[in-house]
Amino acid sequence: MPQSTSEPADTTTRDGAAGARPPSPLARLGRLLLHDRVALLILLLVVLVAWMKMLDRGGYLLGPYDAAYMAAALESFVPLCILALAEMLVILSGRGGIDLSVGAMVSLTGMAFGFMVGEWGWPLWPSLAAALAFGTALGAVNGFLVAVLGFPSLIATLATGYAYSSLALVSNDNAPISSRPVQDLHGLTSMIDLPFGLPPVPKQFFTFLLPCAVLVWLLVNRTAFGRRLYAVGTNETAARYAALSVGGVRFRAFALAGLLSGVAAVVTVGQFASARPDAGTVGNGMALPAITIAVLGGVAITGGVGRVGGVIVAALLVVWLNAGILLYFEGSAGSRYQLLALGVLLIASTLLNAVAGRGRRRRAR
Protein backbone atom coordinates (compact mmCIF):
# COMPACT_ATOMS: atom_id res chain seq x y z
CA MET A 1 0.00 0.00 0.00
CA PRO A 2 1.60 3.31 -1.07
CA GLN A 3 2.61 5.55 1.72
CA SER A 4 1.52 9.11 1.70
CA THR A 5 4.31 11.55 0.95
CA SER A 6 2.44 14.54 2.23
CA GLU A 7 4.04 16.24 5.24
CA PRO A 8 2.08 17.24 8.30
CA ALA A 9 0.76 20.73 8.17
CA ASP A 10 2.74 23.40 9.97
CA THR A 11 0.99 23.88 13.27
CA THR A 12 3.62 26.00 14.90
CA THR A 13 1.44 29.04 15.07
CA ARG A 14 -1.64 27.17 16.17
CA ASP A 15 0.20 25.03 18.68
CA GLY A 16 2.14 28.01 19.89
CA ALA A 17 -1.07 29.90 20.43
CA ALA A 18 -2.69 26.92 22.06
CA GLY A 19 0.30 26.32 24.26
CA ALA A 20 0.79 29.95 25.16
CA ARG A 21 0.68 30.78 28.80
CA PRO A 22 -2.65 32.36 29.74
CA PRO A 23 -2.46 36.00 30.79
CA SER A 24 -1.91 36.64 34.46
CA PRO A 25 -4.75 38.00 36.61
CA LEU A 26 -2.94 41.35 36.71
CA ALA A 27 -2.75 41.46 32.92
CA ARG A 28 -6.43 40.57 32.63
CA LEU A 29 -7.27 43.30 35.13
CA GLY A 30 -5.22 45.83 33.16
CA ARG A 31 -6.99 44.84 29.95
CA LEU A 32 -10.38 45.15 31.66
CA LEU A 33 -9.58 48.60 33.03
CA LEU A 34 -8.32 49.76 29.64
CA HIS A 35 -11.38 48.65 27.72
CA ASP A 36 -14.09 49.07 30.37
CA ARG A 37 -14.18 52.73 31.35
CA VAL A 38 -16.83 52.23 34.04
CA ALA A 39 -14.65 49.67 35.86
CA LEU A 40 -11.64 52.00 35.67
CA LEU A 41 -13.62 54.95 37.00
CA ILE A 42 -15.04 52.92 39.87
CA LEU A 43 -11.50 51.90 40.82
CA LEU A 44 -10.34 55.53 40.67
CA LEU A 45 -13.33 56.53 42.77
CA VAL A 46 -12.41 54.00 45.45
CA VAL A 47 -8.78 55.16 45.39
CA LEU A 48 -9.85 58.81 45.66
CA VAL A 49 -12.12 58.22 48.64
CA ALA A 50 -9.50 56.07 50.39
CA TRP A 51 -6.82 58.72 49.82
CA MET A 52 -9.02 61.54 51.10
CA LYS A 53 -9.89 59.46 54.17
CA MET A 54 -6.18 59.02 54.87
CA LEU A 55 -5.61 62.77 54.57
CA ASP A 56 -8.60 63.36 56.83
CA ARG A 57 -7.27 61.03 59.53
CA GLY A 58 -3.86 62.67 59.26
CA GLY A 59 -5.31 66.10 59.94
CA TYR A 60 -4.35 67.53 56.54
CA LEU A 61 -7.86 68.69 55.61
CA LEU A 62 -9.73 71.79 56.69
CA GLY A 63 -12.81 69.74 57.56
CA PRO A 64 -14.02 66.14 57.69
CA TYR A 65 -14.22 64.27 54.39
CA ASP A 66 -17.02 62.04 55.61
CA ALA A 67 -20.20 60.53 54.22
CA ALA A 68 -22.25 63.61 55.09
CA TYR A 69 -19.83 65.88 53.22
CA MET A 70 -19.76 63.57 50.19
CA ALA A 71 -23.57 63.40 50.16
CA ALA A 72 -23.83 67.19 50.34
CA ALA A 73 -21.45 67.43 47.35
CA LEU A 74 -24.11 65.68 45.27
CA GLU A 75 -25.86 69.05 45.07
CA SER A 76 -23.35 70.20 42.46
CA PHE A 77 -23.15 66.69 41.00
CA VAL A 78 -26.76 66.74 39.74
CA PRO A 79 -26.65 69.67 37.27
CA LEU A 80 -23.13 68.81 36.10
CA CYS A 81 -24.10 65.20 35.41
CA ILE A 82 -27.22 66.26 33.51
CA LEU A 83 -25.15 68.61 31.35
CA ALA A 84 -22.54 65.90 30.79
CA LEU A 85 -25.32 63.65 29.47
CA ALA A 86 -26.30 66.50 27.15
CA GLU A 87 -22.71 66.72 25.92
CA MET A 88 -22.64 62.95 25.43
CA LEU A 89 -25.56 63.13 23.00
CA VAL A 90 -23.92 65.91 20.99
CA ILE A 91 -20.47 64.30 20.92
CA LEU A 92 -21.92 60.93 19.94
CA SER A 93 -23.31 62.52 16.76
CA GLY A 94 -19.77 62.81 15.40
CA ARG A 95 -17.99 65.33 13.19
CA GLY A 96 -16.36 66.90 16.21
CA GLY A 97 -19.71 67.63 17.82
CA ILE A 98 -19.45 69.71 20.96
CA ASP A 99 -21.73 72.20 22.71
CA LEU A 100 -20.03 75.12 24.43
CA SER A 101 -23.34 76.85 25.11
CA VAL A 102 -24.86 74.50 27.70
CA GLY A 103 -23.87 76.75 30.60
CA ALA A 104 -25.32 79.79 28.88
CA MET A 105 -28.52 77.86 28.14
CA VAL A 106 -28.77 77.08 31.85
CA SER A 107 -28.49 80.79 32.66
CA LEU A 108 -31.00 81.98 30.06
CA THR A 109 -33.53 79.19 30.64
CA GLY A 110 -33.24 79.71 34.39
CA MET A 111 -34.05 83.40 33.95
CA ALA A 112 -37.04 82.53 31.76
CA PHE A 113 -38.23 80.06 34.40
CA GLY A 114 -37.75 82.71 37.08
CA PHE A 115 -39.86 85.20 35.15
CA MET A 116 -42.64 82.65 34.67
CA VAL A 117 -42.83 81.65 38.33
CA GLY A 118 -41.66 84.77 40.12
CA GLU A 119 -42.83 87.67 37.97
CA TRP A 120 -45.70 86.47 35.82
CA GLY A 121 -47.35 84.27 38.44
CA TRP A 122 -47.56 81.12 36.34
CA PRO A 123 -48.27 77.82 38.15
CA LEU A 124 -45.31 75.53 38.68
CA TRP A 125 -46.10 72.75 36.22
CA PRO A 126 -46.89 74.96 33.20
CA SER A 127 -43.77 76.99 34.02
CA LEU A 128 -41.70 73.82 34.20
CA ALA A 129 -43.02 72.58 30.85
CA ALA A 130 -42.46 75.98 29.23
CA ALA A 131 -38.91 76.17 30.60
CA LEU A 132 -38.07 72.76 29.15
CA ALA A 133 -39.58 73.77 25.81
CA PHE A 134 -37.56 77.00 25.92
CA GLY A 135 -34.34 75.10 26.56
CA THR A 136 -35.17 72.71 23.71
CA ALA A 137 -35.68 75.69 21.40
CA LEU A 138 -32.28 77.10 22.34
CA GLY A 139 -30.70 73.74 21.58
CA ALA A 140 -32.60 73.59 18.29
CA VAL A 141 -30.98 76.88 17.26
CA ASN A 142 -27.60 75.21 17.73
CA GLY A 143 -28.83 72.20 15.78
CA PHE A 144 -30.01 74.39 12.92
CA LEU A 145 -26.67 76.17 12.69
CA VAL A 146 -24.69 72.92 12.78
CA ALA A 147 -26.88 70.36 11.01
CA VAL A 148 -28.67 72.55 8.47
CA LEU A 149 -26.31 75.45 7.76
CA GLY A 150 -23.18 73.35 8.24
CA PHE A 151 -21.43 75.55 10.81
CA PRO A 152 -18.67 73.86 12.83
CA SER A 153 -20.20 73.06 16.21
CA LEU A 154 -17.33 74.73 18.06
CA ILE A 155 -17.96 78.07 16.33
CA ALA A 156 -21.76 77.81 16.34
CA THR A 157 -22.12 77.00 20.02
CA LEU A 158 -19.43 79.48 21.04
CA ALA A 159 -21.41 82.20 19.26
CA THR A 160 -24.77 81.16 20.69
CA GLY A 161 -23.16 80.80 24.11
CA TYR A 162 -22.12 84.43 23.96
CA ALA A 163 -25.59 85.42 22.77
CA TYR A 164 -27.46 83.40 25.39
CA SER A 165 -25.21 84.69 28.18
CA SER A 166 -25.79 88.27 27.08
CA LEU A 167 -29.56 87.79 26.89
CA ALA A 168 -29.57 86.28 30.38
CA LEU A 169 -27.70 89.29 31.75
CA VAL A 170 -29.83 91.97 30.08
CA SER A 171 -33.15 90.22 30.68
CA ASN A 172 -33.36 91.61 34.21
CA ASP A 173 -30.62 94.26 34.17
CA ASN A 174 -28.02 91.79 35.46
CA ALA A 175 -30.08 91.20 38.61
CA PRO A 176 -31.35 87.85 39.90
CA ILE A 177 -35.03 87.07 40.34
CA SER A 178 -35.52 86.24 44.01
CA SER A 179 -39.19 86.87 44.66
CA ARG A 180 -41.05 84.70 47.16
CA PRO A 181 -42.45 82.20 44.59
CA VAL A 182 -38.92 81.61 43.29
CA GLN A 183 -37.52 81.20 46.80
CA ASP A 184 -40.19 78.61 47.48
CA LEU A 185 -38.70 76.50 44.66
CA HIS A 186 -35.85 75.62 47.00
CA GLY A 187 -38.12 72.85 48.24
CA LEU A 188 -37.50 71.09 44.91
CA THR A 189 -33.86 70.63 45.88
CA SER A 190 -33.97 70.20 49.66
CA MET A 191 -32.12 67.39 51.41
CA ILE A 192 -34.07 64.22 52.13
CA ASP A 193 -33.30 61.56 54.72
CA LEU A 194 -32.43 58.03 53.69
CA PRO A 195 -33.10 54.83 55.65
CA PHE A 196 -30.51 52.65 57.39
CA GLY A 197 -28.70 55.62 58.89
CA LEU A 198 -27.41 56.90 55.55
CA PRO A 199 -26.69 60.63 55.30
CA PRO A 200 -29.33 62.85 53.66
CA VAL A 201 -28.94 63.53 49.94
CA PRO A 202 -30.35 66.25 47.69
CA LYS A 203 -33.88 65.54 46.53
CA GLN A 204 -32.99 66.45 42.93
CA PHE A 205 -30.82 63.35 42.73
CA PHE A 206 -34.02 61.29 42.62
CA THR A 207 -36.47 63.75 41.07
CA PHE A 208 -34.31 65.10 38.23
CA LEU A 209 -31.06 63.21 37.67
CA LEU A 210 -32.27 59.60 37.85
CA PRO A 211 -35.20 60.17 35.45
CA CYS A 212 -32.89 61.98 33.02
CA ALA A 213 -30.25 59.24 33.21
CA VAL A 214 -32.80 56.47 32.68
CA LEU A 215 -34.45 58.27 29.77
CA VAL A 216 -31.12 59.01 28.07
CA TRP A 217 -30.05 55.38 28.54
CA LEU A 218 -33.29 54.15 27.01
CA LEU A 219 -32.98 56.67 24.19
CA VAL A 220 -29.49 55.65 23.11
CA ASN A 221 -29.82 51.91 23.78
CA ARG A 222 -33.42 51.00 23.05
CA THR A 223 -34.65 53.29 20.26
CA ALA A 224 -34.08 53.65 16.54
CA PHE A 225 -32.80 57.16 17.14
CA GLY A 226 -30.10 55.83 19.45
CA ARG A 227 -28.93 53.31 16.85
CA ARG A 228 -28.85 56.05 14.22
CA LEU A 229 -26.95 58.33 16.59
CA TYR A 230 -24.19 55.77 17.08
CA ALA A 231 -24.16 54.95 13.37
CA VAL A 232 -23.81 58.58 12.32
CA GLY A 233 -21.10 59.22 14.87
CA THR A 234 -19.16 56.07 13.96
CA ASN A 235 -19.15 56.50 10.18
CA GLU A 236 -21.06 59.38 8.66
CA THR A 237 -20.35 58.29 5.09
CA ALA A 238 -21.70 54.79 5.69
CA ALA A 239 -24.73 56.29 7.43
CA ARG A 240 -25.46 58.40 4.35
CA TYR A 241 -25.15 55.34 2.10
CA ALA A 242 -27.63 53.62 4.43
CA ALA A 243 -30.07 56.47 3.73
CA LEU A 244 -29.96 57.78 7.30
CA SER A 245 -30.83 61.42 7.83
CA VAL A 246 -27.47 62.53 9.19
CA GLY A 247 -28.55 66.14 9.53
CA GLY A 248 -31.79 65.16 11.25
CA VAL A 249 -30.01 62.96 13.78
CA ARG A 250 -27.48 65.68 14.57
CA PHE A 251 -30.21 68.33 14.85
CA ARG A 252 -32.15 66.23 17.35
CA ALA A 253 -28.99 65.61 19.39
CA PHE A 254 -28.48 69.36 19.84
CA ALA A 255 -32.17 69.90 20.61
CA LEU A 256 -32.06 67.19 23.27
CA ALA A 257 -28.96 68.82 24.73
CA GLY A 258 -31.03 71.99 25.05
CA LEU A 259 -33.80 70.05 26.77
CA LEU A 260 -31.37 68.62 29.32
CA SER A 261 -29.89 72.09 29.82
CA GLY A 262 -33.42 73.24 30.63
CA VAL A 263 -33.67 70.54 33.29
CA ALA A 264 -30.35 71.67 34.76
CA ALA A 265 -31.63 75.26 34.74
CA VAL A 266 -34.66 74.32 36.83
CA VAL A 267 -32.38 72.49 39.26
CA THR A 268 -30.07 75.50 39.66
CA VAL A 269 -33.00 77.86 40.27
CA GLY A 270 -34.17 75.55 43.05
CA GLN A 271 -30.68 75.20 44.52
CA PHE A 272 -30.03 78.95 44.62
CA ALA A 273 -33.66 79.81 45.51
CA SER A 274 -33.09 82.44 42.86
CA ALA A 275 -32.92 82.75 39.07
CA ARG A 276 -29.39 84.02 38.50
CA PRO A 277 -28.28 85.40 35.11
CA ASP A 278 -24.85 83.83 35.58
CA ALA A 279 -25.95 80.51 37.05
CA GLY A 280 -24.30 78.42 34.33
CA THR A 281 -21.37 80.68 33.49
CA VAL A 282 -20.07 82.07 36.79
CA GLY A 283 -16.58 81.05 37.87
CA ASN A 284 -15.35 78.07 35.90
CA GLY A 285 -18.73 77.75 34.20
CA MET A 286 -20.59 74.52 33.56
CA ALA A 287 -19.78 73.84 29.91
CA LEU A 288 -16.12 72.87 30.16
CA PRO A 289 -16.56 70.67 33.26
CA ALA A 290 -19.48 68.93 31.50
CA ILE A 291 -17.34 68.27 28.42
CA THR A 292 -14.51 67.00 30.61
CA ILE A 293 -16.87 64.64 32.43
CA ALA A 294 -18.25 63.28 29.16
CA VAL A 295 -14.78 62.57 27.74
CA LEU A 296 -13.57 61.17 31.06
CA GLY A 297 -16.62 58.90 31.04
CA GLY A 298 -15.42 57.28 27.82
CA VAL A 299 -17.29 59.32 25.20
CA ALA A 300 -14.97 59.42 22.18
CA ILE A 301 -14.53 62.97 20.95
CA THR A 302 -14.68 61.62 17.39
CA GLY A 303 -18.21 60.34 18.01
CA GLY A 304 -19.99 57.02 18.03
CA VAL A 305 -18.65 55.71 21.36
CA GLY A 306 -20.00 56.42 24.83
CA ARG A 307 -22.06 55.02 27.69
CA VAL A 308 -24.39 56.63 30.18
CA GLY A 309 -22.87 54.69 33.08
CA GLY A 310 -19.41 56.01 32.32
CA VAL A 311 -20.64 59.60 32.30
CA ILE A 312 -22.42 59.21 35.65
CA VAL A 313 -19.42 57.67 37.43
CA ALA A 314 -17.09 60.25 35.87
CA ALA A 315 -19.31 63.06 37.16
CA LEU A 316 -19.20 61.56 40.64
CA LEU A 317 -15.41 61.29 40.46
CA VAL A 318 -15.00 64.92 39.38
CA VAL A 319 -17.40 66.26 42.01
CA TRP A 320 -15.84 64.30 44.89
CA LEU A 321 -12.36 65.24 43.69
CA ASN A 322 -13.33 68.92 43.61
CA ALA A 323 -14.87 68.59 47.06
CA GLY A 324 -11.63 67.12 48.38
CA ILE A 325 -9.55 69.89 46.80
CA LEU A 326 -11.66 72.52 48.54
CA LEU A 327 -10.92 70.85 51.87
CA TYR A 328 -7.19 70.64 51.21
CA PHE A 329 -6.48 74.23 50.14
CA GLU A 330 -7.48 77.32 52.06
CA GLY A 331 -9.41 80.26 50.61
CA SER A 332 -9.75 80.68 46.85
CA ALA A 333 -6.74 78.48 46.10
CA GLY A 334 -9.02 75.45 46.02
CA SER A 335 -11.01 76.69 43.02
CA ARG A 336 -7.79 77.39 41.12
CA TYR A 337 -6.48 73.90 41.74
CA GLN A 338 -9.83 72.52 40.61
CA LEU A 339 -9.06 73.91 37.15
CA LEU A 340 -5.68 72.18 37.20
CA ALA A 341 -7.34 68.90 38.17
CA LEU A 342 -9.88 69.26 35.36
CA GLY A 343 -7.10 69.86 32.85
CA VAL A 344 -5.15 66.81 33.97
CA LEU A 345 -8.28 64.66 33.89
CA LEU A 346 -9.15 65.86 30.38
CA ILE A 347 -5.69 65.06 29.02
CA ALA A 348 -5.61 61.67 30.73
CA SER A 349 -9.09 60.72 29.53
CA THR A 350 -8.28 61.78 25.96
CA LEU A 351 -5.17 59.58 26.00
CA LEU A 352 -7.18 56.67 27.39
CA ASN A 353 -9.81 57.14 24.69
CA ALA A 354 -7.10 57.14 22.01
CA VAL A 355 -5.52 53.93 23.35
CA ALA A 356 -8.92 52.23 23.67
CA GLY A 357 -9.82 53.37 20.14
CA ARG A 358 -6.67 51.79 18.71
CA GLY A 359 -7.53 48.57 20.52
CA ARG A 360 -11.02 48.56 19.03
CA ARG A 361 -9.62 49.12 15.53
CA ARG A 362 -7.13 46.27 15.94
CA ARG A 363 -9.88 43.89 17.05
CA ALA A 364 -12.05 44.95 14.10
CA ARG A 365 -9.39 43.94 11.55
Predicted regions and their residues:
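Transmembrane helix-bundle core of multi-pass membrane transporters
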Residues: S153-R222, R252, F272-G283, F329-G331, ...
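Alpha-helical transmembrane segments within multi-pass membrane transporters and channels
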Residues: G121-G161, V313-L317
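Helix-loop-helix "hairpin" substructures at the membrane interface of multi-pass membrane proteins
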Residues: W122-P123, L138-N142, F196-R276
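Hydrophobic alpha-helical segments embedded in the membrane of multi-pass proteins
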Residues: S76-M88, A104-L108, A140, A159-Y162, ...
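Inter-helical junctions in multi-pass inner-membrane proteins, predominant
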Residues: G58-A68, D173-A175, P200, V220, ...
